[in-house]
Amino acid sequence: WIECGEGSALGAIEAAKEVGGYVTGYVGDMTENGPDVVLVNLIWDLEPMFTQMLKDTHAGTFDNPWYKYGVAEGAMLYTINENLADKIPAEAIAAAEKAFDDIKAGKFTVPFIPQAE
């Protein structure tokens, strides 16, 4: 499962334990919540964004801007649960690494798709 949000991630971890599946931790490293079921983690590192906000505030230039921080800015990372790494095909790991590298290098832009009404 891949879920969005810490609460739903914790629920997905419990469900994976019950049925023997695998899950993606979300927001932070959730491996300790399910060391036998959390395959990978998508981690938010918002320190770069908050640092920029503080700098802008200190400089008097903070004017309610929209800060876009993601993979390219180092604010979205992933980790692999080393105890379960053998469950992930090497080509899948290589593809994920390439995608992250391409985003960081500006070779691929993740499209923004607003929610449809």
Regions found by a protein language model. Name each.
Residues 1-117:
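A residue-level marker of the well-folded mature domains of exported/periplasmic proteins
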